[in-house]
Amino acid sequence: MSMHPALRLLATVLVALGAGPAFTQDAPRLTGADRPMSEVAAPPLPETITDDRRVGRNYPEQPPVIPHAIEGYQLSVNANRCLECHRRQYSGLVAAPMISITHFQDREGQMLADVSPRRYFCTACHVPQTNAQPLVTNEFRDMLTLTPASNEAE
């Protein structure tokens, strides 16, 4: 069944009129300045915490943050300053935490003799600890605080 041409035109006009207000509404923005092309001052960089104390993680599977300064560390295809302290054979000498065993696995889960190439560039996951305030409220609670056995111990 085909629609009469006049009805088709009327339906098209009604749809267009109804969609008009939807197109004129402002789209919600996630971030940025009120005027996207205007220049705004960059916020100050947060201060790096360099007290060498490890801190708890903020969410499950979070890579540990770096509790010391890394400015000037060489991290390239030819050199990785992080490995001078955190490689298995050196970590005991300098009291640095050893690299996780997961960093020695390739994509297929096979163990390698040295750090996997996909885990070689530490700062792809690990970042220096700073005094930056969270952008959103963190409601993460460690599993140990949620289990009945740990609640009885309190």
From Swiss-Prot:
Gene Ontology MF annotations: metal ion binding
Region (Disordered): 27-47
Keywords associated with the record: Electron transport, Heme, Iron, Metal-binding, Periplasm, Signal, Transport
Matching SUPFAM superfamilies: Multiheme cytochromes
Family recorded in the similarity comment: Belongs to the NapB family.
Protein name: Periplasmic nitrate reductase, electron transfer subunit
Subunit composition and interactions: Component of the periplasmic nitrate reductase NapAB complex composed of NapA and NapB.
Record bears the keyword Transport: yes
Modifications after synthesis and translation: Binds 2 heme C groups per subunit.
Subcellular location, record wording: Periplasm
GO biological process: one example: anaerobic respiration
Signal peptide: 1-24
Pfam families assigned: NapB (PF03892)
UniProt GO cellular component terms: periplasmic space
Gene3D superfamilies assigned: Flavocytochrome C3, Chain A
Induction: Induced at high levels by nitrate under anoxic conditions in the dark. Induced by oxic conditions, even in the absence of nitrate. It is suggested that the extent of electron flux to nitrate or oxygen, under anoxic or oxic conditions, respectively, serves as the signal for induction.
Gene assigned in the entry: napB
Consequence of gene loss (knockout): Decrease in nitrate reductase activity in deletion mutants and failure to grow in dark under anaerobic conditions.
Known function: Electron transfer subunit of the periplasmic nitrate reductase complex NapAB. Receives electrons from the membrane-anchored tetraheme c-type NapC protein and transfers these to NapA subunit, thus allowing electron flow between membrane and periplasm. Essential for periplasmic nitrate reduction with nitrate as the terminal electron acceptor.
Binding annotation for heme c 2: H103, C122, C125, H126
Sequence positions that bind heme c 1: H68, C82, C85, H86
